[in-house]
Amino acid sequence: MNAEIIAVGTELLLGQITNTNAKFLSEKLASIGINVYYHTVVGDNTRRLQEAIRTAEKRANILIFTGGLGPTKDDLTKETIASIVKEDLVYDEAALTSIREYFNRTGREFTENNKKQALVLKGSTVFANNHGMAPGMGLHKNEKVYILLPGPPKEMQPMYNSYVDPFLRNVTTGEHIYSRVLRFFGIGESQLEVKVQDLIDNQTNPTIAPLASDGEVTLRLTAKHQNVEQAELLIQQVEHLILERVGEFFYGYNEDFLHHKAIELLKKKGFTLACAESLTGGLFGNQVTENAGVSSVFKGGVICYHNDVKQHILQVPEETLQTAGAVSEECARYLAENVKLLLQSDIGISFTGVAGPDASENKEPGTVFIGLAIKDEPTIVFPLCLSGSRQQIRERTVKYGFYHLYKKLEEM
């Protein structure tokens, strides 16, 4: 089935707020096999909203609205949809009671216009708003499904997760929809697609949807079946075929992230980590410490941006800095080995390179070296040639650091 997301609010058109709801909803709908081909943003204007609805009805089975459910005159989503589907608006007593209780609890005066927020389309399924006042609703009418949700993300997102997701699963095909995301790193989107192109070309059930983001590639596999176990089996069969071809670049599923996976392995193996950061300037250490309980494995780090710090704190020989340079395999090796010794950790990882925008030491932006010293094993240096802005190069360098750390730990 196809859905269209219609965001209502003049503030969106003026650029006063960002439409994060569309991103959230698109991701959620994709995970249950509902296609989203159009995002529409319309201001607080009845005529233009009517036009947007009629256009959407021609190209989508499911129309999802965010915003315009509040108490003011310019909150007109419900009234406009009611006029189009020819349904009355009626008070939902549970919502009205909840709104009155909110005003009593906060000591604010309950004005008549606030009753408007409890109006719902007659015959609709009402979605309770556990984080605000205006309820949402879902109506199946004239072979279309109309979903109305509040605009504030803190209200809309939990409402979707608790009520809309099961509602949509029930009114679509009656089939179980099972989705799994495979995450890859160290391979480009085009390279990965070439290796699995025949599977993509011949996809039926499950479907395969590639997506590239920040140096990573994901494949979303979505299967439909009356039996949930059979839907999962369909996913597993295609996943096996994919990993036979590109398994060396695979690192996790769904909401797994490289830094989480690497830290999990560190904890599992009981190793400690220290880092020496030049071009990344603390980005790696920052991501490490985003993980709760990481003090058990992370000793700390040295931001060795200036050569004096490399030489006097991390004992990189002056000769190495003068001949090979700070941006070199030799320097990365010294940094990884010596930060490990300095902070008495099992593993030392180092980052040195040119973030740009200008060249340095006659080396182009994107020239990067990552050093990895693990216990008594020979130190490994990974050379990289990255592209992008200064910030993109730094962020991608950090991801490569976690990737190489994860892969090396996985081997041990």
From Swiss-Prot:
Pfam families referenced in this protein's UniProt entry, alphabetically: CinA, CinA_KH, MoCF_biosynth
Disulphide bond pairs: none
SUPFAM superfamilies: CinA-like (SSF142433), Molybdenum cofactor biosynthesis proteins (SSF53218)
Family according to the record: Belongs to the CinA family.
NCBIfam families, A to Z: cinA_nterm (TIGR00200), molyb_syn (TIGR00177), PncC_domain (TIGR00199), PRK00549.1 (NF001813)
Protein name per its UniProtKB record: Putative competence-damage inducible protein
